[in-house]
A protein has these predicted regions:
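SAM-dependent transferase fold signal centered on methyltransferase-like domains
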Residues: 1-569
Length: 569
């Protein structure tokens, strides 16, 4: 560098850089309308000063872009050039025009890069001071909401809705409730797939044992019947009448992926089928799925048919505690029966001479014992754990004896006691998962009337991500083998999930935060032998006598000899 070369003062250099960022940032932001409770879209129209670079020949567009460099009008938020169509309307569509920052002076070369000034001299480009117009449609939902909500209260409310089909579900509390109409309208305007916005009036389950909640339609059409896809399956239900949480999709996938071909699974509080249907469709589990809510049951029946797993998922409509015991009895009764599943599309030709892609029919034998129970009713599912006491009393010979080696003749063919997955809430977050686990363990022990202990705590979201990454690596390796790029030895072993439990040991897994002081957990454990084989008391209460009588009637009923069927008393 020559001694005569002027060196820019670092302070001036920083100031110049700051202006390049702040000036367009201020220009392109939505106008402030703090306190706007009724959305006025016209109020967001604003005029901004710019310099328009008119390019004479389209072949010079890239050259002008490069020459303009730092004086391009960029949106600092998304780091892209502002679209001329956005600023200049029809003229921006019809001509080769690029917007520049207003600090560029049309007749002052010192305010622009030298290369751009040279192109002007060559008559390749012409600079014109020009006003641009921005309207409501040009601003994102975050910008609009930031401009109307109190600055000290805005916390990303635009991200705070759950999308269920065409419905956006909001939870608005405190001062935000005063802006509910404006917030709802912005959400429906800025999200093309949203046709209805609803807000929860009361907490889930506050007025219904079915986990439904009273809701208010804030914007859009009054239609709560939704159709959506989740976990590779399709669902249809009335969002106002059943429970559904789209944020649990990863958890649905995680548990469904624990199931294997031919496993008998009991989904005690199945809802419309988000655990049961993926477990059957993707992993060929045989799922006995129950929900007490009649609307959930009817939706589940439709969803089972729509996903073509009618022979694999058996919907029921009864009390969960009753279902645990009756389904276990019925499973034992029907053990050994064959279930046939056709994996081919309904309309596919069944002649292999015509259809080269025809898959063979799959057959599964009904086992004597459920491999796992799923209990997704976090507010009260743990209260149903007492139904497992004595569930297999008198049937000890069906199960492996921990004191014997699996090499003992006949021992390996016996069953292991089922794994229980029960969901619950706790006030502690993931940061205090050990404290949460202690409290949950005490509660579970109480309902089982057996001293459980915590073997491990887990972040289930991390486990799911890791398992999906491992599955992706495995699939990529298999593709490489098929294409001849890799040998079969390059395929990694399928990742195994740790489902080993000591007697009375349990894992407590963090699922998600529901509220600042409320988190959802999944407790998993193998049913302790002492609980499973516990002999019932000799004296039964009146309610227990009634249930025993109902069981006897159901198990003897000629109408229920065809399994599966709708369990009703």
């Amino acid at each position: 560098m020559s001694s005569n070369t002027p060196v820019q003062n670092p302070v001036e250099q920083d100031e110049e850089m700051l202006q390049r960022v702040l000036l367009p940032s201020a220009l392109l932001r939505a106008p402030q309308h703090l306190g706007m409770k009724v959305l006025d879209r016209e109020a967001f129209t604003k005029t901004i000063p710019t310099v328009a670079a008119y390019i004479k020949d389209r072949r010079d567009i890239q050259r002008v872009r490069k020459a303009a460099g730092s004086v391009f009008l960029l949106d600092p938020l998304d780091r892209t050039t502002v679209d001329p169509k956005r600023l200049y309307g029809d003229e921006g569509k019809q001509t080769y025009i690029l917007p520049l920052v207003p600090s560029v002076k049309v007749d002052d070369e010192s305010t622009m890069p030298a290369d751009l000034a040279q192109l002007i001299k060559e008559n390749k480009v012409e600079l014109v001071s020009k006003e641009g117009i921005l309207k409501y449609a040009d601003f994102g939902s975050e910008e609009i909401l930031k401009s109307i909500l109190p600055r000290d209260r805005y916390d990303g409310i635009h991200h705070g809705f759950t999308l269920t089909g065409h419905i956006a579900h909001l939870n608005l509390h405190g001062e935000f409730a005063n802006y509910k109409d404006a917030i709802a309208q912005v959400i429906i305007d800025k999200n093309p797939g949203v046709e209805t916005v609803v807000s929860k009036i009361e907490d889930v389950g506050s007025h219904s044992e079915f986990r439904t909640f009273p809701m208010e339609i804030l914007a859009g059409k009054a239609d709560t019947q939704v159709t959506l896809r989740s976990s590779g399956c399709s669902y249809d239900f009335d969002f106002a009448k059943v429970y559904w949480n789209s944020r649990l999709e990863n958890e649905h996938d995680r548990v469904a992926n624990l199931c294997s071909k031919g496993d008998a699974v009991c989904d005690v509080m199945a809802g419309v089928g988000p655990f049961a249907i993926p477990a059957a469709k993707h992993n060929r589990a045989l799922v006995w799925a129950n929900d007490l809510n009649g609307d959930s049951y009817e939706s589940m029946v439709r969803n089972v048919a729509a996903n073509k797993v009618t022979n694999l998922v058996y919907p029921f409509n009864t009390d969960g505690r009753e279902f645990i015991r009756l389904s276990s009895k019925a499973l034992l009764r029907d053990a050994g029966k064959t279930i046939t599943f056709d994996p081919n599309p309904p309309n596919a030709p069944r002649d292999p001479a015509i259809n080269s892609k025809l898959k063979p029919l799959e057959t599964y034998l009904i086992p004597k014992v459920f491999k796992r129970f799923i209990m997704n009713l976090p507010a009260s599912a743990v209260e149903f754990l007492d139904a497992f006491a004595g569930l297999y009393a008198g049937q000890e010979s069906l199960f492996q004896d921990p004191s014997k080696s699996l090499e003992t003749p006949g021992e390996a063919e016996k069953y292991t006691l089922p794994i229980i997955h029960v969901y619950t809430f706790n006030r502690h977050t993931i940061k205090d998962i050990e404290e949460a686990a202690k409290e949950i363990c005490t509660i579970v022990s109480g309902y089982l009337d057996y001293p459980m202990r915590v073997d491990r705590t887990e972040n289930l979201r991390d486990i799911y991500v890791q398992s999906m990454q491992a599955k992706t690596r495995e699939n990529n390796a298999k593709k490489a083998v098929i294409s001849g790029k890799e040998s079969a030895s390059a395929v990694p072993e399928t990742a195994k999930v740790d489902e080993s439990f000591s007697e009375g040991g349990m894992s407590v897994g963090y699922v998600r935060a529901v509220a600042p002081v409320k988190s959802m957990y999944c407790v998993s454990f193998r049913l302790p032998a002492e609980v499973a084989f516990r002999q019932p008391p000799k004296e039964l209460t009146d309610l227990e006598k009634k249930l025993e009588q109902m069981k006897s009637i159901w198990l003897r009923s000629d109408e229920q000899t065809q399994w599966p069927g709708k369990l009703k008393q």
